[in-house]
Amino acid sequence: MTKIRNFAALIDTTLIQTKMNIPANLKYTNDDEWIRLEGEEAYVGITDYAQHELGDITFVDVDPDIVGETLDAQEEFGAIEAVKTTAELLMPVAGEILEVNEALADEENAKLVNSDPYGEAWIIKIKVNDVAELDGLLDAAAYEAKIG
């Protein structure tokens, strides 16, 4: 399997993209991850576009021992494996890992990333160090423009 730095490396610009689900209440990274803020805590996952580009998800690899660690923005916190490739998961903002969605480590449940990327397939829950850091992320319109 090829390991890639981010999901954007999978894009074939010669293909016409289908309409992707891009909820307006989320913020997005250039690495095709989303973050949903709830107070000072936030849920993080990969976008509908990312799961579509990756194909069938087989495993979400986030060590549960990471809970309690504080990571910087763009620091790797895990990986996601698909039939096509493996991709790194990067922190969208700095924060403390509060919870890992361990259900996704099961191959059957990992498929939730394909069917429900913004719901049951959240990957980690974090305590955001600085909520203002989200201002540097993409809103839904900017993310939609990015993926074309």
Regions found by a protein language model. Give the residues of each.
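Short coil-to-beta-strand transition motifs
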Residues: 25-29, 87-94
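Aromatic- and Lys/Arg-enriched surface recognition patch
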Residues: 98-124
